[in-house]
């Protein structure tokens, strides 16, 4: 069955491509030369570690990892426990409060519980230099994450893609809308949230789609690992 395929099965070949090896080498060289790179090396591929290919139900595309200390840990929009909730995620919580009955905004921005339920929180670029947004945008990560999206498109069916902002929407242009459910809105950033992110109802619509397919909806209330045991 297609959904038994793992990331390792479908990405092993891609990870041997010269461009990908060059990307890893460039990042490793920068780290070795003393440049602070986020997220830490062990966290770069967490999106794939927490959400296996066969478990993907929803894809949320981010752009660049957070470039402040302690924020990025490999999941788009998410920050580690104890780190202030960034503005875009705060706006996501506001949309959830306004649309999901009983949702109360948590005091943290750690979204591992979403990832464990099948929400792939994928940044299109997987590393960044400290304090320098988009500093790794041309290293080859975009080619890799394009491949990831095309593999989900090819090997899975009925995945909900939440594409917020023009960058994500361009990135998602290859998705087959006959096989998958694509929802578009402005980015939740304070610069654009009022242009249609608020009121987009994407979290509700995603769950409705999953339920129609007989799948378990996402519990959008983020819980810290200790709370969920």
Swiss-Prot record:
Its EC number is 3.2.2.27. The keyword DNA damage applies. GO terms for biological process: base-excision repair, AP site formation via deaminated base removal. It catalyses: Hydrolyzes single-stranded DNA or mismatched double-stranded DNA and polynucleotides, releasing free uracil. This is Uracil-DNA glycosylase. GO terms for cellular component: cytoplasm. PANTHER family: URACIL-DNA GLYCOSYLASE. SUPFAM superfamilies: Uracil-DNA glycosylase-like. Excises uracil residues from the DNA which can arise as a result of misincorporation of dUMP residues by DNA polymerase or due to deamination of cytosine. HAMAP family: UDG. Keywords: Cytoplasm, DNA damage, DNA repair, Hydrolase. Monomer. It comes from the Bacteria. Belongs to the uracil-DNA glycosylase (UDG) superfamily. UNG family. One of its GO terms (molecular function) is uracil DNA N-glycosylase activity. It is found in: Cytoplasm. The active site is at 64 (proton acceptor). The keyword DNA repair applies. Its main location: cytoplasm. Gene3D superfamilies: Uracil-DNA glycosylase-like domain (3.40.470.10).
């Amino acid at each position: 069955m297609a959904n038994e395929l793992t990331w390792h099965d479908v990405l092993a070949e891609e990870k041997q491509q010269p461009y990908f090896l060059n990307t890893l080498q460039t990042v490793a060289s920068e780290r070795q030369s003393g440049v602070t790179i986020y997220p830490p090396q062990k966290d770069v591929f967490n999106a794939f570690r927490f959400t296996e290919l066969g478990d993907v139900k929803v894809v949320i595309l981010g752009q660049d990892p957070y470039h402040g200390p302690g924020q990025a840990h490999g999941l788009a929009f998410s920050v580690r426990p104890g780190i202030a909730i960034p503005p875009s995620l705060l706006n996501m919580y506001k949309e959830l409060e306004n649309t999901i009955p009983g949702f109360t905004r948590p005091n943290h921005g750690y979204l591992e519980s979403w990832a464990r339920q099948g929400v792939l929180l994928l940044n299109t670029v997987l590393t960044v230099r400290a304090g320098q947004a988009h500093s790794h945008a041309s290293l080859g990560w975009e080619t890799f994450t394009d491949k990831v999206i095309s593999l989900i498109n090819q090997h899975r069916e009925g995945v909900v893609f939440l594409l917020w902002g023009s960058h994500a929407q361009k990135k998602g242009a290859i998705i087959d809308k006959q096989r998958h459910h694509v929802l578009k809105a402005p980015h939740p950033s304070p610069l654009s949230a009022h242009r249609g992110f608020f009121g987009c109802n994407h979290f509700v619509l995603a769950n409705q789609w999953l339920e129609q397919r007989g799948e378990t909806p996402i519990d959008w209330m983020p819980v810290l690992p200790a709370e969920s045991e």
